[in-house]
Structures are given as C-alpha cells and as structure tokens.
Amino acid sequence: MAGRPLHAFEVVATRHLAPHMVRVVLGGSGFDTFVPSDFTDSYIKLVFVDDDVDVGRLPRPLTLDSFADLPTAKRPPVRTMTVRHVDAAAREIAVDIVLHGEHGVAGPWAAGAQRGQPIYLMGPGGAYAPDPAADWHLLAGDESAIPAIAAALEALPPDAIGRAFIEVAGPDDEIGLTAPDAVEVNWVYRGGRADLVPEDRAGDHAPLIEAVTTTAWLPGQVHVFIHGEAQAVMHNLRPYVRNERGVDAKWASSISGYWRRGRTEEMFRKWKKELAEAEAGTH
C-alpha cells in the first residue's frame, strides 16, 4: 500500500443523507490519474494530510512513503471508504461516510468538510459485482455497507430476484435506494448508533444476524454479499452462509468485516490479518 500513488482531489460538495451519513463529492486534478473500477464494492483509501504539512516539499512520486520522514504525529492516517458513485463526465467521485459523533477520523472530517478542501486518496480497489448468472441475490450489512449495497442494487438487471437487509440506528437513517421490483429491501433497526448500543444489540447479538438467518431461503443459486461489523459478519453470518446453507466460496467470497466495534481501523486491519492467518492454519 505504501508505494501506491496518491491522487490529489478536493471537496466539491457535501450533503447529509441521514443523521449518521454524509455524502462528500470529490473532484479536481486527481481525476486525471484516477481509473474508476467496474466493481460495485469499489473502494478507495482516503489519506488525511494535516493542513500544516507542505506536500509540495515531499518526495515524488507522492505515495505514503513520501511521509515516512515526518514526525509520527504528522504522518497521515488512512481510512478505507466505498465509492458510492463515479460521474466520469463531471469528473467527480461521491463517497458516503458514516458519522460517529466526534470519534474517528473520516466521520469528523466529512461532517466539517468545506468546498475546496484538499484530500488525497489511493485506489480504487474492489472484488465484487452481482453475477447475472445467479438465480437470486442476498445482500446484507450495516451503515458501512450501504454504499456498496446501493451500487449493487443499481447494477442488477431489471428482472433480478433477491433480498437486501440493512441494519441502521432507526427509521430516520433509511435512505432512498433503487432496486429491481423483485428485490426486497428490508431495513433493520438496532435502536442506536452502532458504536454506542448495548452489547445485547451488537456483535453476536446484532439484529442483522437474526434478520438474515430467519428469512426464507429462495430456490436456486444465490450470490451473497455481506459486510459490516466484523463480529456479526465473520463469526455469525459467514458461518451461516458457508456452513449451514452450504454456499460455495465462488458464490460467497464477499463476506467480511468493514470495521470492528471498539477498534480503530489500524487495530482492525491487524486483527483481520491475524484471523485470516489463523483460519488458513486450520485448513
């Protein structure tokens, strides 16, 4: 990741989509080197450079390595975000960011982002797009997965069949989604912000788990996309889909955590790597 080039963008506009979600539209010269992805879970790495860092004096080409000689406190934090939409004609990228009050890096930045404010990013990456060969589609996640789920729903053919489950704090956090007529979108309420609700509404007890595991399983080959809080997804929903429902890895490869309650992204990445190594050792 350190050697990947950084694209220089700036904030074009912001808009609140819900109490806990802000859309930030990015544009500028960075689009000259940014190549959009065809995946509906396309993601970028936002690089938050302090205003007092003179980027023009850093080694070129500009990568994360360019910041290596700065004091630790001045090295930019990096956060992974899903691309909601790319408007190639307007040369703009829309990124929908979940707000967690004053906590975190991306949320406070998005809440206070101003037009013309610079931001650097790497990417995009991605690995999932709904397979038209599937008989039906199962999509599920919390707020962090809404951009990818929304993009996937829009990419489905008009005659697609499926179910989507999205866990949010409450009714005010629902946003408008476009889906084929035969794809049922279900909003699941947890009763509060994901990082603040009691333990009996999070992790192994997240309402999303019950919503997915109690829904009627449709006939035919399913293509699965499930992302969100890691404990709920990786220790509950992934075993349910792969083991209990017997869905082959080809059709259920995109089931993973986007974040983990009580951990920063740096801590989460470390935990996720350790989990992958442990799972690899059991096979």
Curated annotation (Swiss-Prot):
UniProt record, GO biological process? cellular response to iron ion starvation; iron import into cell; siderophore transport
Cellular component GO terms held in the UniProt record = plasma membrane
The FAD-binding FR-type domain covers which part of the protein? Answer: 4-131
Q: Which GO terms describe its molecular function?
A: FAD binding; ferric-chelate reductase (NADPH) activity
Identify one Pfam family in the record.
Answer: SIP
Protein name as annotated: Uncharacterized protein Rv2895c
Q: Which organism is it from?
A: Mycobacterium tuberculosis (strain ATCC 25618 / H37Rv)
